[in-house]
Structures are given as C-alpha cells and as structure tokens.
A protein has these predicted regions:
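Bacterial N-terminal signal peptides that target proteins for export
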Residues: 1-9
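Active-site neighborhoods and metal-handling regions in enzymes and metal-associated proteins
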Residues: 2, 20-488
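Bacterial N-terminal signal peptides
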Residues: 8-17
Length: 488
C-alpha cells in the first residue's frame, strides 16, 4: 500500500518536471520568491492602483530570444509578447500569454502559452492566466472599473540582451534625432495606447498613468540569496574566462583571440550569452577608449592588455576588469602606476559593510592611502599626483550597481543612503595620466553582506606578480590555434 501511495505522489511530480523541461521554464526562483516581489510592489503602489508590465517582443531573425529584465524578474517567463497585470485593489496577479503557436513550437520548441494555464499557475504562482487575445476591445476600461485607479507602467527603457538603461537612452535619443527614422520607444508607445484605450474624460475620471520604473529599480537593488548565488556563479565564470585569456596572451596574438578564449570558458560553463560586449584592449590608445570593442589589434611586446568581460548567466551578470603585460613582465613604470590602484581597491573593499555610506568608506580608505603614500615614495612625481588625484576624487571607487544588467537599474541610488545587505555593485578604481594618455584600472564586483562584504572576484589574480605568472602559462589559444591564418 505504501509503495502505491509513493507512486501516486511521484508520478505527478515527474510529469511536472517533464512539463517544466519541455516548456523551458527557469528553475532558479520558486513561486514564493515571485510572490514576495509582487507583495513589495503592491506595498509601493498602494491598494488603489494597478500596474501593467510589458514583456519583450519576438526576437528578430536568429537573435537569441531573451526576455526583458523586469518581466523576467517578476515572472521568470520568457514567452515573448506577454503582459503582467498586478491589481493593487485585490492584490491579485494575472499573466497574459499569447495563444499557443504550434508552428513556432515545431521549429523552436514549446513555450508557456495561454494553453498552459494550470502549469503556469504552478510554476509562477499567479492567480490568473489569460490569453493576450482577451486584452482587446474594452478590456482596459473594464479592468480599471468606474473608480479608475492610477495605472503604473515602466517609463524607462527595458533592458534585454547585453543592454543597460543608459545605453538604451542614448540609442533612443539617436533614433529620435534621425530625421528619417524618429520611431518612439516601445514603452512610450505603450503609454500612448493606455491613454487612448483607457476611460475617456467625459465618461469617467481621466486615467493617470504613472512611472513604475523607480519602484522596480528599488526592488531590484536589493538582491535575494538566490540572485546573489547567480551573480556569484556569473563572476566565477567571468574570472576563469579572464584567466584563460591571460594565459593565452603572447606577442603576435590578436585581441579577438583573447576574447575567444574567455568566451570559450563562458559557453563551456553554461553561460548562453554575453553580459556585455567584450572590452579586450591592448596598447595605450585602445585602453584609453573606455568601451573599446573592435578587438582587432595584434598584441605587441611592451603593451598592457585590459580585459573587461563577463557573461550573462541565467539573466544575471558580473563585471570584472584586469590588466596584464603582453610580454609577461610589467615595467617599473607600469608597476608604479598599478600598485596604488590595487592598494586603493583593497582599502575600499575591506571597509565595505552595512550601515555606513559610501562617503564614509571613501574617507576611511583615503586615510589609509595617506599612510601608504608615506611608506611608498614614487620615483615619478607625475604618477604620484595622478594616484593622489584618484584618491581625492574617488575615481571609479564605487561604480555602478550590477545585477540583471551590467549597469543595473537604479543608477547610483545605493550611494545616497547607508549600505544594506544584498546591494551589489562594482569597485573600479581608476588612475589617469592625461599627459601620457594613460588610463589604468581594476574592477571587481562585490555584495554587501550582513557581516561586511563578499568580493565575488577575489579568486582572480590581481597582484602584479600573480598576473605575470598567469601570462607564462599555456592558454587555450596555444592549444587550439586558429584554423587558418588571415592572408597578408
């Protein structure tokens, strides 16, 4: 009898597991975590408001499909052209999914759809699952009712693959200024449609559409334990990718070969996509181009390499940067510039903890650097001035937040209040010598913990001797050389 009971319990679980795998649904977040996020959102918008979050459109051509960060954060659903309706009056959540597309499923595999109601409820925990076809006609007016609550929706661009909000803002501005284009961003078009299809002034109070972006930014700024685990894994993969690139460094190798070495490690460890395009820069001019991306230059003895590169691992990323010598040996001048960057980074990270502001930490690290300057005289006065300027200005010290995007939403809001556990950001101290066109930096991604800080990338070599040693090892580029040489 006991075995038969176990069978009846086991069979549905196995069927659910098979269904989940068949629908390609994420396994990192349970329904309880999504419910916690919805509850926080409800608390912010109030009990007399509703929210609508639009998912990503279909991928163009053979682009890798990827959901927008906010929609994935709230649902874990990757199906394109989906919508999430959160009703603060009832605290009920409805997801609208497209009807099942059998033709698409035959070509690309199954996705959650309006035909998988029970499965979606089990996986996501939503109260209702409906078809996007149900959103036609008077759906919006009927859903709002006679009292017409405020309607929240994101006003700011929603990030997708290898995208951050700042870069999207720039792209949208360029499109708007193009006299032969001028398309409105998708989120702006949605706002216009909501106003057009909502209640009219003559038959109900006018619909007030409000910005949900700041609320989502605040929610995403504090990472859960599961989110931290994904960023930790993304950081590990990024670090080992950079290690493989450093091992592969030789004079005569091309920047794109180092890029390939790192990307090989990313793919080998389950990262499907890049978190952002690779910065693999060699030589003064390329390094001094902050977001250099061409990666076509041949490495030359005497140059430094800057690699800043990390994957997108299950919708979470890291941010990491290291510099090393092409020929395996730092010059005395390079050491004199890089040592203060490393020491400043260490002093900053050691002092990160909850309950203090970044300004307090900057002051504490600056005091520690004063002692270091006293004990470590410079041979080059210009370099000393550059190092002191870095500390005085806090250049790059507390950089951008990191999470689902490399420059995560929320801008630099974490610096405006005492630090809290779960805040993730990059520490990127930067030294500049404009007279010599020099720009040097090291970058790590950290999380504030209840006891202090965790540096996700502290396993990666950063001390100069250790970096030199890495470049003397054989890398994948030497083990698997290019198939053919580019013709001269």
């Amino acid at each position: 009898m006991t075995n038969r009971v176990h069978q009846w319990i086991l069979i549905p679980l196995l069927l659910l597991a098979c269904s989940v795998d068949a629908q390609h649904y994420q396994s990192d977040f349970p329904p309880e975590e999504f419910r916690g996020r919805w509850d926080k959102l409800f608390d912010r918008i109030g009990d007399d408001a509703v929210a609508l979050v639009q998912g990503a459109p279909s991928a163009r051509g053979f682009e890798y499909p990827r959901q927008t960060n906010s929609f994935y954060y709230l649902t874990g659903i990757e199906t394109p052209h989906s919508y999430l309706w959160l009703d603060g009056r009832s605290r009920e959540v409805t997801v609208f999914l497209p009807p099942r597309n059998e033709r698409l499923e035959k070509g690309e595999g199954k996705l959650l759809s309006a035909a998988t109601v029970d499965l979606v409820k089990q996986l996501v925990g939503v109260d209702h699952v409906k078809s996007t076809d149900d959103m036609q006609g008077n759906w919006l007016r009927e859903s709002l009712g006679k009292e017409v609550p405020d309607l929240y929706t994101p006003f700011r661009p929603e990030e997708g693959y290898a995208q951050s909000r700042y870069e999207l803002d720039l792209a949208n501005t360029n499109i708007a200024n193009d006299h032969w284009d001028g398309r409105l961003p998708r989120e702006i078009r949605l706002i216009g449609l909501l106003k057009a299809r909502g209640p009219k002034p003559w038959d109900a109070p006018e619909l007030q559409v409000r910005d949900l972006s700041p609320i989502l930014d605040d929610l995403r700024m504090i990472k859960s334990e599961r989110e931290v685990a994904l960023i930790r894994r993304a950081s590990e993969i990024a670090g080992y990718g950079v290690i493989e690139a450093a091992r592969s460094t030789r004079p005569g190798v091309y920047e794109y070969e180092l890029d390939a070495a790192a990307r090989y490690v990313f793919l080998l460890n389950g990262a499907r996509l890049d978190g952002y395009r690779s910065i693999t820069a060699s030589g003064i001019d390329n390094i001094n181009t902050g977001h250099y991306f061409r990666n076509t230059r041949e490495l030359r003895s005497g140059d430094l390499v800057l690699m800043d590169y990390a994957p997108d691992y299950r919708y979470y990323v890291s941010d990491i940067g290291r510099m090393w010598p092409v020929n395996g040996t730092f010059t005395a001048e390079q050491r004199e510039l890089l040592e203060p960057v490393l020491r400043y980074r260490d002093f900053l990270i050691e002092r990160i903890r909850p309950g203090v502001t970044t300004d307090q930490i900057l002051e504490e690290a600056a005091a520690a650097m004063e002692d270091w300057f006293d004990d470590n005289p410079f041979n080059n006065k210009r370099y000393e001035e550059a190092a002191r300027d870095m500390v005085e200005k806090g250049s790059g010290a507390f950089s951008h937040p990191v999470g689902m995007a490399v420059h995560d939403d929320g801008d630099y809001n974490y610096r405006r209040a005492p630090l809290q556990p779960g805040i993730v950001f990059s520490v990127d101290p930067t030294i500049r010598v404009p007279e010599e066109n020099l720009y040097l930096r090291y970058e790590d991604t950290v999380v504030v913990t209840k006891d202090g800080v965790e540096n996700f990338t502290d396993f990666l070599a950063s001390e100069l001797d250790d970096l030199e040693a890495l470049t003397r090892e054989e890398g994948v580029v030497q083990k698997v050389p290019a198939v053919t040489a580019w013709p001269e």
